[in-house]
Amino acid sequence: IHPNFNPLLKGEGGNPDAILNDLMDSYPKACGVRSHSLTQNGWLLSKFKEIGMLYELNHFLPYYKSLSPFMLWCGLLRIPFNWEDDYHFALDYSFDNCGIELSESTFNIFNFHPIHIYLNSENNNRFLNVKNDMGNIKLLNENRNSGTTKGTRDILLDLLSQCTMQSSKSLKMIDVFKEHANKS
């Protein structure tokens, strides 16, 4: 699930239980969580476990080379991630290279936002142009990066190609959880 606690943090009312219950009603088989803005604290982590989450992905270590999942005190597996599309372009990095080495001996988690894949965003301006009208397909298509400057979609396709060529192992998050649980 991908709860958005930002309205609560802005004082706009609501409560975390209602947000989580609504999501679990819609996605009763969900077993992992990453919050909008990576919002977390001890109470929320315990609440995630209470509603049936097995793992969470709210810990961002940009470009870190030695990722390793670990168990939290509440019984959730924390799976850190080391690359995110909007962070990459916030630093004004080129999408010619993700800045992370892919090899058999490294564990990497890449976070891609679907809207940035669709727009092939190379900067945040593309998203800001459509943010308030994302149901408008014409507007979305007008703001897609189809030029020579590489963007989010391009780097995703490049990573998938590299993984295929190197026969890299890719896993779903539930499989990362199962692998780690079997080691514990």
Which positions does each model-derived feature cover?
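Metal-dependent polysaccharide deacetylase catalytic core of the NodB/CE4 family, i.e.
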Residues: 1-46, 110
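Terminal accessory/targeting
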Residues: 21, 25-29, 42-54, 59-184
